């Protein structure tokens, strides 16, 4: 049993729940039909915005699946349901470290307003998962 991996998995279960519930509600507000009421779906502007919105939905789905699978892997490793695997552990740890650093850099480079940076502080969770998983790898 590895409590560090269990903790990383639990953090990701929480992140998944928050992502699905709050993220779905937040993202629905950006639906092009809400911004451009009364315009036909065939309208070029609506179609372009709809395509961009759907691409964002694809990314949202990818992140949802990634959070769920990563949580499952960390919990399975922590509970001893699957054997320790250094490559898997390193991959998961570096994935979250990379996401944390990259997302923080994007927010800084974009010079987003403070309220936006505060709302989008996902990098804190990503780095906490990476640090926790790194501690688990050391055992």
PLM features per residue range, with description:
Residues 18, 56, 65, 118-121:
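Residue-level micro-sites within transmembrane alpha helices that shape
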Residues 2-9, 50-60, 86-89, 115-119:
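Membrane-water interface of alpha-helical transmembrane segments
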């Amino acid at each position: 049993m590895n409590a560090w991996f269990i903790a990383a998995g639990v953090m990701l279960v929480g992140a998944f729940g928050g992502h699905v519930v709050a993220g779905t509600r937040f993202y629905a507000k950006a639906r092009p039909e809400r911004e451009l009421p009364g315009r036909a779906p065939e309208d070029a502007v609506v179609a372009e915005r709809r395509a961009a919105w759907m691409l964002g939905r694809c990314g949202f789905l990818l992140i949802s699946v990634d959070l769920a699978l990563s949580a499952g892997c960390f919990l399975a490793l922590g509970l001893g349901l699957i054997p320790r695997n250094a490559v898997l552990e390193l991959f998961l740890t570096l994935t979250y470290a990379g996401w944390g650093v990259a997302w923080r850099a994007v927010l800084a480079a974009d010079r987003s307003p403070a309220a936006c940076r505060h709302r989008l502080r996902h990098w804190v969770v990503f780095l906490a998962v990476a640090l926790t998983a790194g501690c688990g790898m050391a055992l």
